[in-house]
C-alpha cells in the first residue's frame, strides 16, 4: 500500500474515526501524539544545559590601567565619561546586558586588552 493510498483513506475518515485511529496507533507503537511541552528550567540550575542566546558582560575589576578601562567602557557603552568612570569605580558591575555571544566576546576582548578583568555570564 502506497503513502498516497493511505492519505486518501485518511481523508475519507470522520473526526471520530481519526481519533480512534490515533489512539490505536499510540497503543500499538507505545507513542503519544501529544505535542512536546517546553518547560523553563530553574534559574541557574537545569537551564544551563540549554544553549544561552543572551549574555551579560560584567566588569570584575579595572586592574592597574583604570584610565584605559574607563575609555574602553565609554566607547563600548556610549556612556559619558563620568558615568563610565563611576561604573569602573564601582566594579564588579554589568557593563552590557542581554547581548549576543559574539558581541559579548568582542566586548570582553576589548576590556581585557585595556587591562580589565571581565566575566561573560
From Swiss-Prot:
Gene3D superfamilies: 3.30.1390.10, Single helix bin. CDD domains: Ribosomal_L7_L12. One of its GO terms (molecular function) is mRNA binding. Disulfide bonds: none annotated. Pfam families: Ribosomal_L12 (PF00542), Ribosomal_L12_N (PF16320). Keywords: Ribonucleoprotein, Ribosomal protein. GO terms for biological process: translation. Forms part of the ribosomal stalk which helps the ribosome interact with GTP-bound translation factors. Is thus essential for accurate translation. This is Large ribosomal subunit protein bL12. It comes from Macrococcus caseolyticus (strain JCSC5402) (Macrococcoides caseolyticum).
Amino acid at each position: 500500500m502506497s503513502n498516497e493510498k493511505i492519505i486518501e483513506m485518511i481523508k475519507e475518515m470522520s473526526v471520530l474515526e481519526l481519533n480512534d485511529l490515533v489512539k490505536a496507533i499510540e497503543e500499538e507503537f507505545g507513542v503519544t501524539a501529544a505535542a512536546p511541552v517546553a518547560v523553563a528550567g530553574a534559574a541557574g540550575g537545569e537551564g544551563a544545559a540549554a544553549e544561552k542566546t543572551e549574555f551579560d558582560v560584567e566588569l570584575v575589576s579595572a586592574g592597574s590601567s583604570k584610565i584605559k578601562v574607563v575609555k574602553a567602557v565609554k566607547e563600548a557603552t556610549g556612556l559619558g565619561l563620568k558615568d563610565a568612570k563611576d561604573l569602573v569605580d564601582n566594579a564588579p558591575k554589568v557593563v552590557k546586558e542581554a547581548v549576543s555571544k559574539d558581541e559579548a566576546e568582542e566586548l570582553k576582548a576589548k576590556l581585557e586588552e585595556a587591562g580589565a578583568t571581565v566575566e561573560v555570564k
